[in-house]
From Swiss-Prot:
This is Gabija anti-defense 2. Counteracts the host Gabija antiviral defense system. Probable nucleotidyltransferase. One of its GO terms (molecular function) is nucleotidyltransferase activity. One of its GO terms (biological process) is symbiont-mediated suppression of host innate immune response. Signal peptide: none annotated. The keyword Chaperone does not apply. Keywords: Host-virus interaction, Inhibition of host innate immune response by virus, Nucleotidyltransferase, Transferase, Viral immunoevasion. It comes from Bacillus phage SPbetaL7. Disruption phenotype: Knockout of this gene prevents the phage to overcome the host Gabija defense.
Length: 400
């Protein structure tokens, strides 16, 4: 079945902007939101899974630029508010498809997903039956069985039932866990799905771990249930900190005029607020020697001139130098270019009398870069790029 009605309802709930971002990053929504959708219940929050750390970070960057409010950030998940929606990015692991996500889930009633790569639902064979019967069937391969044990009460409050054999299966699966440190115990006690009992041991260190002592510590604690509604958050100050925690791949970095920059997940050069956990340091001179930048200019009577200032000329084989002194209130003292993958974003892209020029920039002339746009005080004009060639650039960029 196509479940077109449920798909339309999901898209309407998420909104066009978010749907397009989820498509671009080939995300998968799975779990409670899909269960609520098929049970005709109100959706409380949306758990979003990704195929790679690159896709997860790309999605977060897109959302960050549209004014989201991050409410919690743990090693396993990041929860943020986008307009009225509560979105939880799951990043303790990355998944190739819905079935691999289901392998980590605890109950079949959660095993529903919508894949934005295929724009189709994937449902476990017992998903609809067990939801209609309101019964819990446990998956012993779940990633966090202690959390599953805690979640039983949540489902019984929603009038689901669990048989004694199924409950025993959860307990026995918990017994099979290998836990040798407080950190491993905390990892099994929460940090996602609204279960945050890892906070029971947030002040404990890894040395001298003893499970029986840990059990006794719980008995001695007097804590209100509301205490466990908020997760143990990782500290972060900006987007880079969040990306550093989610990204498992090395980040290419370089220092330009004493400022730290990185090659972002979108491939563009941008200033780096904090150092990534793992990095590949690029040689700055080598980077500028091998990198070309681009700009659309007016071609008239054989001359290449600026669209912004018709008297400013770019001559192939010569240096072009910005006029005036740099200030923060105007374009004075700066020339503006695009990285190769961002030429379509150029202010003058599509102008009838426009042509694309290729330039080199030296480190000493570099001013700033962000989202594919580059500022410099001067450049060396290399050549005029043919229309067929730059259209191939755009075609290649759009196919990525």
């Amino acid at each position: 079945m196509s479940y077109q009605f449920e798909k339309n309802k999901l898209y309407a709930y998420l909104g066009e902007e978010l749907v397009e971002a989820l498509k671009r990053n080939e995300a998968i929504i799975a779990g409670g939101a899909i269960t609520s959708l098929f049970n005709n219940k109100e959706i409380n929050d949306v758990d979003i899974y990704f195929r790679s750390d690159k896709k997860a970070c790309s999605f977060l960057e897109e959302c960050w630029n549209s004014n989201v409010y991050v409410t919690s950030h743990t090693k396993k998940a990041t929860l943020f508010i986008k307009k009225r929606l509560k979105l939880q990015m799951i990043h303790f692991k990355f998944f190739s498809d819905a079935e691999s996500i289901f392998n980590t889930f605890d109950f079949t009633v959660c095993m529903g997903a919508f894949d934005f790569k295929t724009e189709a639902f994937t449902l476990h064979e017992d998903f609809l039956k067990h939801n209609s019967q309101r019964i819990l069937k446990f998956n012993s391969q779940t990633a966090f069985p202690i959390v599953s044990l805690l979640r039983v009460q949540k489902y019984t409050d929603k009038e689901y039932t669990i048989s004694k054999p199924e409950f025993i299966r959860i307990v026995l699966t918990c017994m099979d866990l290998t836990i040798n440190t407080y950190e491993e115990l905390k990892d099994q006690m929460g940090g996602m799905y609204g279960i945050n009992y890892d906070k029971l041991f947030e002040d404990e260190k890894d040395e001298d771990f003893n499970l029986r002592e840990a059990v006794d510590k719980i008995a001695d604690m007097v804590l209100d249930e509301d205490y466990f509604k908020e997760p143990v958050n990782l500290e972060f100050n900006d987007l880079d900190d969040l990306l550093n925690d989610i990204n498992k791949s090395p980040v290419m970095t370089l220092k330009i005029n004493d400022d730290q920059y990185r090659i972002g997940l979108d491939g563009f050069l941008k200033e780096s607020v904090s150092a990534p956990c793992t990095e590949i340091k690029l040689d700055t001179k080598d980077f500028f020697d091998k990198t070309n930048f681009y700009k659309f200019v007016r071609k008239q009577n054989g001359k290449l001139t600026s669209f912004y200032d018709k008297n400013f000329e770019y001559v192939i084989g010569e240096e072009a130098k910005a006029e005036g002194v740099i200030d923060s209130w105007s374009n004075s003292g700066k020339l503006f270019f695009n990285e190769k993958a961002a030429i379509e974003q150029s202010t003058y892209y599509g102008k009838e009398d426009g042509v694309l020029i290729e330039v080199k920039i030296k480190e000493k002339d570099f001013v700033d870069a962000d989202n594919g746009k580059v500022e410099a005080t001067a450049c060396q004009v290399i050549r005029e790029v043919s229309k067929d060639e730059w259209k191939e650039y755009i075609s290649a960029n759009n196919s990525k």
